């Protein structure tokens, strides 16, 4: 390290010496020229034939300098104390010689011409300005200069090589071919594929979207689309391809397709049970029948409470489940609505029940919902017990009811059939005990059993949102026992039981078979009628729920109705189909379902109802915003809007209609639909006139001089021109005159002038029939 520093210092000194030498030469030249104006000095300068002589003398010492401009040679000599020295320079050969003595003499080859002297000593100038140069100059100066030049040359050479290397690398980068770049991209893609390899086999259902298939194959959707285009199939990223196309596409990448059924993945494996643990269970009884035939009254008698006080209009709005004890035995009753809108509820009631009690009024007899209940029970293969109600009324006719029901294969036992008939009066508490005895007898004959030690299985009867507790679902347990903390799947929803509340409103830790219970803990709102089943773990519940959601999406995608150009042209462009959009909110999911089905049935060729959104719960700000954006009205069934929702509805001018009885909701929507119907246009005959003269008025047209034979003729009336009993023209009266006056109408037996719009081919003897157009309001018919 110190050696390098010394070398650098030595180089610096040498550079300074060279610079000072150059400076000395300049000073000498300057003094030579300045001697011309200073004749008192001891310096002599002679010029002759392009030759210069310079001499200097001090203390007996002489010096001489000569320069030959033509020969470019010079000599220098110095004598001091008898010693001599000489210096010569040849500019062409760039060589120099130096000899030192105490006496300095500068001698030119030819000393001639004038001499000039100066008082300034050149020797003194050298000693004053650069005293170290002359004394330190030696024979090694040229070697040091060469060494310095060598190092400078090496440094310059390194810089040149560095520049050449940079240019060479740049040229190599720019000269890469497209093939090389493609190769690098392929190598990069290969590395990515190694990180996310394509599976050897892929499971799909009947069809799959390109994006989903790409996700399963760990590829980009654009790659699959490009491959399909190469195969001659044009698709978009969200378009579905069938299993055959998917198989061909996947095989292009060296994989295989397994067409599977998602239905298998949504089924929870049944628990292996010990049949010896199955014991007798209480019967589940569903009370069914037509509206207002006394079903709810019967159940209230069984419970010794008056449920009708809490039901709007005396109509059961959703399923009520209750358990009673009779003769030390439990019986669970389900009360289903009798209104036609609640078909799905009655169907579910029949599916989860053991016995159906069909209530028929002894006055009204068999009604539409009575027949429907019979069909539901037969479809579910459930035995029926007929309870003929209201026998206390004077107009009751039980035999008539038996005869009507026998037409539906419900033949009484006393008529030789196998159907149990019981005559009751729920109002007067007549025949109730006999009915309960028949129910228990039928249950004993059916040998109803269940295993309380297995995981619970049941059905979701209804669901609602409670402001204080969240989602609350009514569940009927068909088999097993449900405990607080159990993980479960309800339809496509999963959850964990947080609380169990029985029909008395009491929180319990568990519930056994054939019992209805309110379950808290659903992750989302299930649909009424969904299967309910407890799983081993919460992880399994989430997995089954996810698979069932995929299944719902798959099935809904298959059932999407396609819009054809014909439908689009007929219903939208011509405006022949009008639409009433509704956002439906109700207190429970069952009511939402029933009302939605009833409203969407109100459709004909001109108008239809479309429920754009429906859910259980209060009317919120989100519902109002949705209604405003979609131009819909909001219907609340047993629910009301929040304060903020009502304020927003007033601001957005959104109509909110609230109902407590389903009759009123359906009736009002029908009225709205009738107002949307285009009225019928009818032509009413008002009279006719005979053409007795034809007058052609220039710049006006042809005027028919007529005599009103019958009725009257009105201006703007629609006319039919009749000739020889045939209609030859139909048009509108554009002008009606009496003499020169315009009139609105002309009565019978008066003459008038009639001009028909855009018609001039009128002749004498023609008959002009006049009609008045009337619009008649339509009544809604489905």
Swiss-Prot record:
Residues 289-296 are annotated as: G1. Residues 335-338 are annotated as: G3. Gene3D superfamilies: P-loop containing nucleotide triphosphate hydrolases, Translation factors, Translation initiation factor IF- 2, domain 3. GO terms for molecular function: GTP binding; GTPase activity; translation initiation factor activity. GTP binds at residues 289-296, 335-339, 389-392. PROSITE patterns: G_TR_2. Its main location: cytoplasm. Residues 1-106, 132-174 are annotated as: Disordered. Residues 1-14, 44-61, 143-159 have a biased composition (Basic and acidic residues). Belongs to the TRAFAC class translation factor GTPase superfamily. Classic translation factor GTPase family. IF-2 subfamily. One of the essential components for the initiation of protein synthesis. Protects formylmethionyl-tRNA from spontaneous hydrolysis and promotes its binding to the 30S ribosomal subunits. Also involved in the hydrolysis of GTP during the formation of the 70S ribosomal complex. This is Translation initiation factor IF-2.
């Amino acid at each position: 390290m110190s050696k390098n520093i010394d070398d650098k210092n030595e180089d610096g000194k040498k550079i300074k010496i060279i610079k000072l030498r150059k400076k000395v030469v300049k000073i000498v030249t300057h003094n030579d020229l300045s001697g011309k104006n200073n004749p008192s000095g001891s310096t002599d300068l002679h010029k002759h034939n392009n030759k210069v002589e310079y001499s200097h003398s001090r203390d007996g010492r002489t010096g001489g300098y000569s320069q030959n401009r033509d020969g470019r040679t010079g000599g220098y000599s110095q004598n001091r104390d008898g010693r001599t020295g000489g210096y010569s320079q040849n500019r062409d050969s760039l060589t120099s010689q130096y000899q030192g003595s105490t006496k300095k003499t500068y001698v030119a080859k030819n000393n001639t011409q004038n001499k000039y002297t100066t008082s300034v000593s050149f020797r003194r100038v050298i000693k004053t300005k650069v005293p170290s140069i002359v004394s330190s100059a030696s024979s090694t100066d040229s070697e040091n200069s060469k060494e310095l030049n060598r190092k400078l040359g090496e440094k310059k050479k390194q810089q040149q090589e560095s520049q050449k290397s940079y240019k060479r690398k740049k040229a190599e980068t720019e000269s890469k071919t497209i093939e090389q770049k493609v190769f690098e991209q392929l190598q990069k893609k290969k590395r990515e594929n190694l990180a996310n390899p394509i599976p050897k086999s892929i499971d799909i259902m009947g069809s799959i979207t390109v994006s989903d298939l790409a996700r399963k194959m760990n590829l980009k959707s654009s790659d699959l689309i490009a491959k399909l285009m190469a195969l001659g199939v044009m698709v978009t990223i969200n378009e579905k391809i069938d299993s055959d196309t998917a198989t061909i596409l996947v095989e292009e990448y060296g994989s295989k397709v397994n067409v599977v059924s998602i239905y298998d993945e949504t089924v929870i494996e049944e628990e292996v049970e010990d049949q010896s643990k199955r014991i007798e269970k209480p019967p589940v009884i569903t009370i069914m029948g037509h509206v207002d035939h006394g079903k709810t009254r019967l159940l209230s008698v069984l419970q010794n409470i008056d449920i009708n006080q809490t039901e709007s209009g005396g109509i059961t709005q959703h399923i009520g489940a209750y358990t009673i004890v009779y003769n030390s035995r439990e019986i669970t009753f389900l009360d289903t609505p009798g209104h036609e809108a609640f078909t799905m509820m009655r169907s579910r009631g029949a599916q989860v029940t053991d016995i159906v009690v069909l209530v028929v009024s002894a006055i009204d007899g068999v009604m539409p919902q009575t027949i429907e209940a019979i069909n539901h029970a037969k479809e579910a293969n459930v035995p029926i017990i007929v309870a003929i109600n209201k026998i206390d009324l004077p107009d009751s006719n039980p035999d008539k009811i038996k005869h009507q029901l026998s037409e539906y294969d419900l033949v009484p036992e006393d008529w030789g059939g196998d159907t149990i008939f019981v005559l009751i009066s729920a109002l007067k508490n007549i025949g109730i005990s006999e009915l309960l005895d028949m129910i228990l007898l039928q249950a004993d004959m059916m040998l109803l059993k269940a295993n309380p030690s297995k995981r619970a299985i049941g059905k979701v009867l209804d669901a609602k949102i409670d402001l204080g507790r969240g989602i609350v679902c009514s569940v009927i347990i068909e088999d097993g026992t449900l405990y607080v903390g159990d993980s479960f799947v309800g339809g496509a929803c999963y959850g964990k039981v947080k609380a169990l509340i029985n029909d008395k409103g009491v929180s319990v830790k568990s519930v056994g078979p054939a019992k209805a219970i309110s379950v808290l803990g659903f992750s989302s709102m299930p649909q009424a009628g969904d299967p309910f089943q407890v799983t081993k773990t919460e992880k399994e519940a989430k997995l089954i729920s996810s698979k069932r959601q995929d299944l719902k999406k798959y099935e809904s995608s298959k059932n999407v109705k396609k819009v054809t150009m014909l439908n689009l042209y007929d219903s939208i462009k011509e405006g022949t189909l009008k639409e009433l959009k509704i956002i439906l909110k109700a207190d429970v999911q069952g009511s939402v379902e029933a009302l939605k089905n009833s409203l969407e049935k109100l459709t004909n060729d001109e108008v239809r109802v479309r429920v754009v959104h429906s859910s259980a719960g209060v009317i919120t700000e989100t519902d109002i915003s949705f209604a405003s954006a979609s131009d819909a009205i909001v219907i609340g069934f047993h629910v009301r809007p929040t304060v903020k929702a009502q304020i927003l509805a007033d601001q957005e001018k959104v109509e909110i209609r609230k109902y407590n009885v389903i009759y009123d909701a359906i009736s009002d929507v029908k009225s709205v639909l009738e107002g949307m119907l285009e009225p019928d246009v009818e032509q009413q005959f008002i009279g006719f006139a005979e053409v007795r003269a034809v007058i052609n008025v220039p710049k006006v047209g042809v005027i028919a001089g007529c005599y009103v034979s019958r009725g009257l003729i009105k201006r703007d009336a629609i006319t039919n021109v009749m000739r020889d009993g045939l209609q030859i023209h139909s048009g509108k009266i554009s002008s009606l005159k009496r003499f020169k006056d315009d009139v609105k109408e002309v009565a019978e037996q008066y003459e008038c002038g009639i001009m028909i719009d855009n018609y001039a081919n009128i002749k004498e003897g023609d008959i002009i029939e006049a009609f008045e157009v009337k619009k008649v309001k339509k009544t809604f018919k489905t």
